[in-house]
Amino acid sequence: MYRNVLVWPNQKLRAENEKIENVEDVQDLIKDLIDTCNVKMGAGLAAPQIGVNKTIVVIKPSVFGKENPDPSEYNPDYMVIVNPELNNQGEEIKWKEGCLSLPDIDAHVVRSETTLLKYTSEKGEEKRLIAEWPFSGGIQHECDHLLGKLFIHRMDKKKAAFLLDRWRRKKRKARIKAKRALKAARR
C-alpha cells in the first residue's frame, strides 16, 4: 500500500530507529516501502521516510546498473535490507544525490567507493554483501536515513543552509502561485 513520504524538516526523519527483532512482523511494511518507492519512482526508500522508525530499507539495484543480489519475493526488482551494518571502504567519491524527503533538491556529497554490508534479509537470513560503486553509494544514502541523516547532513553546513534556504523560498513561491490559481479558478 502506498504511503506518503515525509518531507524535511519532519522530525520523524531525525528520530532514533528501532532494530527489527522478527522480520515476520514487518512483511506489510516491506510491501508498503516497495509500493511507495515504485509510485514515487525512487531508487530506494527507508522506513523513517514513511513515518515508521524501524531499521529497514528497500533499494532497486538496477537503478545503479547492478543485478539484484537478493531479490524480494514481493517484487524482485527490489532488495530488502533489515538491520544493516555498514563498513565503508575505498576511495571517497563525490557524486550528485537527491532524496524523496527533499524533493527538487540535489547536491554533491562524498561517499565511499565500497561498502561491506551485513544485514538480515526479508526471510530472516543473516547475509553479507560487498557493494561496489555506484550501488554502494545508494546503500549508504538509504542507510543514512536509519541514522537520522539526509544527504544535506553530509554537506558543508554553509552550503546545506544555502541550499535549504533556496528550497524554502521556491516552495513558498509555489504555494503563493497555487493559492492565486485557486482564487482565480473560483471567480
Feature roles, as predicted:
Residues 1-187:
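Positively charged
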